[in-house]
């Protein structure tokens, strides 16, 4: 028995060790196979050959994802671009792009609140208007009222603009001018000091009349906010986590009628800028967003011998809540016929003004104005000192002299000065608009809009053609007519003079206080 007992007891460890060795083998097998499985899975994920993904057929790119171009292909792309000697401002980037956003319409519907619209008066081409429109669509603008003339009203440009969801194109026809000639504005005093003058004054009156019409359109469309912007300006909705203008205006108190966006001015660092929205990242801050001591303490350095702190205006732009009796108060502000609007000024958000960002802007502005290049005559045509000086230079100097003047007065080439003013906070880097517009371009949004528009029949080609027949003289009639048709029951406060473009505070402001 003892032997049997000892024999049986000695066999127990052998029986118990069998399951232990089996589990160890399984664990070893698992540890061995798991890395191999993960490696195989990773290989399958990054494998570029063999399988044909039907989704990739939607893309016209040979490579569907960024990073899938070989070194040899990159060299050939660079060679082809350099050989052509031109840059495709509207088309696809020469680098690979993510293909699934092509035909991205940004067709916002009425359920998105608040509903925001922008109105502008423009003669710019597609290379400027398309990035401008789609950038503002990205940040939450749903509707655009484009009062077009010149290049913007040409058939090749207008037919593209008409196909964009949310864009309303208004041509400067004789019918429009006759309608605006009957505006109540001509019987009021707040804009009267700008009547009967050429160039910038004429444009200022025209913008105000267009803004008045845009208010009516915005009311009919159920818009909640309206903003007047030029096509060389972008809203910068800083201060919101989502970089959203809709979020920004949605948080405004219900008793606020007007929201003022201080403007920042572009500070270009090269004289060969082609596409400002994608190439300019440095801006000069507005007085309203700086400490007083910082502003005046660095005023001379920031001005660099120019007439004012900003090259052009410094009083920003404004968004108005769409409501009864709203009226424009010049291109920069809004007013109300029945009350003084409750205004707030934003502490972080701004309007980015791309001021003379291209050397060619000197001559293009000159060509739009028939003013004589004398110090006396330019005061009739331009409101701001820098515009006057730029017009005289563009009208009298040689190309070499113009370029030298442009480099001295507009381009920031002094690296030490830039670094100093960046540290002081006078200058700042803003990359969001650049990134958004570059991504839209690389996604093929702009090129697909142009291609789609030219494949479809034009909606209003006859209107565009008739617009091109309107002479400059008939257009100038807008600033010279005054039709007295209304007896207005308005108080004196509602007749406050229109707010023109104004320069920022100068050093004389501190001397006056002393």
Swiss-Prot record:
Its main location: secreted. GO terms for molecular function: glycosyltransferase activity. Keywords: Cell cycle, Cell division, Cell membrane, Cell wall, Cell wall biogenesis/degradation, Cytoplasm, Developmental protein, Differentiation, Glycoprotein, Glycosyltransferase, Growth regulation, Membrane, Secreted, Signal, Transferase. Residues 1-39 form the signal peptide. It is found in: Secreted, Cell wall; Cytoplasm; Cell membrane. The keyword Signal applies. One of its GO terms (biological process) is cell differentiation. Involved in the coordination between cell elongation and cellulose synthesis by promoting the expression of genes involved in cell elongation and cellulose synthesis. Acts as a regulator of plasmodesmatal permeability. Maybe a glycosyltransferase. Belongs to the glycosyltransferase 25 family. This is Glycosyltransferase-like At3g57200.
